[in-house]
């Protein structure tokens, strides 16, 4: 969960495209057309769909796309309210199924075997999509996935209360239009205390604007009901869950719940990288993803850790 990356020049094989689909507007079966925005790279091989975290966007995957494009058809989709994908309609409560259908709509029409990669909220969306397409999704990578509702189901009430506190704060100040206040809390929670204070003025403006879709995303991750054991039956055995053992309490507890219920999965711990590692430490996270998806080992340049601000 972080602010969207700055605009970058597009290479010929990493272009911005869109697809006409349907959007839930003001009630069941009331749809209007809209465009699903995504970036793509590569032209052959299995389809890899990349699903970004909150307050980010499809551009967060640009380095990973570069490492995958020679062997996969890669699409990084913008969820509701990101990039050129329209915002979620305020009168409707968002669900994980809504976001999963959006990603499904962005699939190439001739897609066969599908691999999914999701970070944080994108991980929860990827889980839901994999459950919708069990015969087609062959591999799933979850980077600190955030289905917070599992905490309440499992009785992890301290962790659930911590997540609810953040949720309530975003809902309260978002409803008041005080997005800078909400953004400060959000940034410091996920990126560490003092993150907001270190941001430039322009970065604060961008972060506050990018936070707005998260107002609706909380409904999706809090109102889901699928039990942890059911995820074990619905999702592919070839699932990788990556977590920093020192990450925030709710994510640590979610990881523990899934470890206990989904024993056939692979688990990787990357100490000291934090929740935002896919953006701040791609040198450590991307090789894990590339390896698990079955791509040939490539020399992935290690880059220094970046920081918000």
Residue ranges and their predicted role:
Residues 203-260, 266-269:
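Conserved serine/cysteine hydrolase catalytic core
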Residues 118, 122, 126:
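Gly/Ala-rich beta-loop-alpha elbow adjacent to hydrolase catalytic centers
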Residues 34-89, 112:
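Conserved HGGG/HGGXW glycine-rich cap/lid loop of the alpha/beta-hydrolase fold
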Residues 127, 131-132, 137-174:
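Flexible "cap/lid" loop of the alpha/beta hydrolase fold
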Residues 97-114:
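Conserved acidic catalytic loop of the alpha/beta-hydrolase fold
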Residues 264-309:
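Catalytic active-site module of serine/aspartate enzymes centered on a nucleophile-bearing elbow/loop
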Residues 78, 115, 138-141:
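Residue in the alpha/beta-hydrolase core beta-strand immediately N-terminal to the catalytic nucleophile
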Residues 175-218:
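Conserved alpha/beta-hydrolase catalytic His-Asp/Glu region
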